[in-house]
């Protein structure tokens, strides 16, 4: 580490100017814990102006503060570098000029104590003297070596012996493929499907691949295309089940609910509900003309007595959850506002400006809807009643091959329905990893139970052990996150894992945009995923990082499989991989202690094929354990 040096005259003058502005900011925003985060000096229209970036916009005689994340001109700080030009849109105006200086500020008790500018950190000691040293708090994003810039796709790799044995099992043998992230579970599952298709030869043949997320569905379609396998139905479970249910049960509402409470979803997906259904199915149908229909769902979920029976069977579903189901069901069986006006009212006069229903966004927004979770419930009630009557139940479409990927996210009734989709003599392929089970409502127990639910108690289990995606240090860190007893790797500054600790969101956005901008120059074909804990956080990071670099918000599976930066959430990235992964909220608030947080962080970090970067504006999540930088080492660890 270099010895700090004294400041030259120009540096002293700049620090003095910024200190004066910071003092004025403290006077302008006396209640703000941090009245300013950064300094921006621009030249526009022949004049030089100084601005501070802070928590809100303030215009005064002594200082102008721009809200850092919203003010149009503040975008020049993120979109340009010192000495560069900027051009920004502000409504119907264009703001243009040149950035003369930009720096990140550190305040203590309202006074400027440090700033970073152009790779140099200026700090004031206890005696008020300033010194300069290299800025070490840079975003640790590094380009891939040339050898890793054109890796083969997941289906183009040569299988190892263990993977090949799984692919070569005879048709009709149910296969369970397990293993941690990056070991090739999806590769094996799809290669087995391709091998079965080739062995089948000419003649009718059908297959389906069912996945939990839209992003994985789109990736699977692309991988099958590369394998040259045609005619495979690739769907998310929700869309697959919806299509089947609408064919089988004709009184299902057109709309699906958007605001079902988490507790209601948890109860409807729990095994305890499946255990109660035989008694409910023994009752006469609510509609004598149908073996089962929507009115049966009303009698089941709208009756607190039945919901109390579910609660009595498990500690994982609460009376509060049952109450949420009851309240949600009551709304679902109400008329919509549009319907309440009757047929005599012109529907065009009821149209809203945004095209949504009148009830949307209100407590009655789910009126006249069905829950996605109801589809499997309907099929199970129908199956039970058909069996009691000696009749044929409503059947899902049957396939010669059914592949379930990330199957740990499927609930018991969903698995039962999917198991019925395998044709007699057909082949079931199941891939999953309990360590990546992030949907708290899925009710995953263990793999033997899941395979019984699928009707495949007899199956071949293959556990893959070699990770092909992640660097060994990333794999070791992921194991440590999932299981604290697993040793943390010794992470060096030149390794595949980086840490970036910032004192606020503005600093974090600036550090990451600078790092992403440099990476785009050094490794323009790299794919980067900024994986936030939630969708709301992903939208926030897409907005603030998008002020400086091109960032694509990828939610609801809307991924671009190629170079560029995408902001998304943990739930979206199952089964996907990127060259670089940034976890921008690796704090104890986003990832608290507990199994759910551990699995979520594990999923995020194991998406990285080259480098994983953790960033935070608060305390590091305890889930990083011994791998997290110590407070005393934080500056040195952020390189």
PLM-predicted stretches and their roles:
Residues 205, 214-218, 222, 226-242, ...:
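Conserved helicase motor core of SF1/SF2 NTP-dependent helicases
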Residues 36-42, 375-382, 531:
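Short, hydrophobic/proline-enriched secondary-structure or compact coil segments at domain edges
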Residues 102, 108-115, 120, 124-254, ...:
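P-loop NTPase Walker
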Residues 194-404, 408-420, 426, 435:
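Alpha-helical nucleic-acid-binding subdomain
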Residues 39-41, 114, 176, 430, ...:
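A structural signal for short, well-ordered beta-strand segments and their strand-loop junctions
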Residues 1-156, 160, 164-165, 393, ...:
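Extended, charged low-complexity regulatory segments
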Residues 7, 144, 148, 209, ...:
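Generic alpha-helical structural element
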Residues 151, 155, 185-189, 370-377, ...:
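Phosphate/oxyanion-binding active-site loops and adjacent basic polyanion-contact surfaces
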